[in-house]
Amino acid sequence: YEITTRLVGSEMCIRDSVVTGYGTIGGCLVYVYSQDASVLGGSMGEMHAKKICSIYSMAMKMGAPVIGLVDCAGLRLQEATDALDGFGKLYLSQAMASGVIPQIMAVFGTCGGGMAVAAGMADFTFMEEKSAQLFVNAPNALEGNYKAKCDTAAAAFQSKETGAVDFTGDEASILAQIRTLVSILPANNEEDFSEADCQDDLNRMCTGIEGVAGDPVQALSMISDNHFVMEIKKAYEPSMVTALIRINGVTVGCVANRTELYEDCLLYTSPSPRDA
């Protein structure tokens, strides 16, 4: 792992509350930025944004994923419009990278205000399940609400109610899932990711698959290489399953509904017969 520019003209701090660098995960090149809440609260400022945008620029040139490890107090007020401009440049970098390289973000601490928008622009968002906070406006900003009543910034709410978070867990499990995700995704939109080494037999029998048709996670596990299934947005609307699997080394996206567990949850393109 190599750390990139430590000093980008900032007089505030040698790191300006974010560490940027690049390295490999299972032989795959990745670019990473990690916000440091112990320095200026990890807040977004002009140089902070420049360091992250620099990482995006390098990742786009090399065609490699960007991973963001977030712990940000939000906008650095003392930098005023310069900090606001920094958010704008970050959003532009993310928009230009969308559909070109994978963007993965993991929220380990606070992710408030403008940084929450950046998390929403990522392709995959992870969130630490106990102490992480993700919000544009704090829970107390909602009329009649307070944090103890309904913590709209917590991982449970963001994963179950809004669907803004794809995966939750402790720090170790999140890092492990990110490593797994990087290993099954193409590095960019032009990479020939047709096949990876696969020891599983494509033509093997899936005995008993007819008995698990009502629970697609089990069915997908049976047809996938080495029974690998990575379910996305697992907590959000459990009657539907979205997942990534591998078949003969090829990564495949899957969508299915759990008819066995939620047999009454049907999708209608016209008004439901029950409404008649």
Kindly label every feature range from the protein language model.
Residues H48-A49, L84, G120-D123, N248, ...:
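Short, solvent-exposed amphipathic alpha-helical segments in soluble enzyme
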Residues V32, A59, D71, V117-A119, ...:
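Hydrophobic alpha-helical segments that mediate membrane insertion or helix-helix packing
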Residues Y1-G9, I14, Y268-A276:
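Single conserved hydrophobic/aromatic residue that forms the stacking wall/gate
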Residues K51, Q177, T269:
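Charged catalytic carboxylate motif
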Residues V70-E190:
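Conserved catalytic cores of soluble enzyme domains
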Residues Y33-Q35, I67-V70, A106-F108, M127-E129, ...:
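Generic beta-strand/beta-sheet core signal
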Residues R6, S10-E11, R15-V30, D36, ...:
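Intrinsically disordered, low-complexity segments enriched in small/flexible residues
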Residues S10-E11, R15-S98, Q103:
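Long, structured ligand/cofactor-binding scaffold of large enzymes
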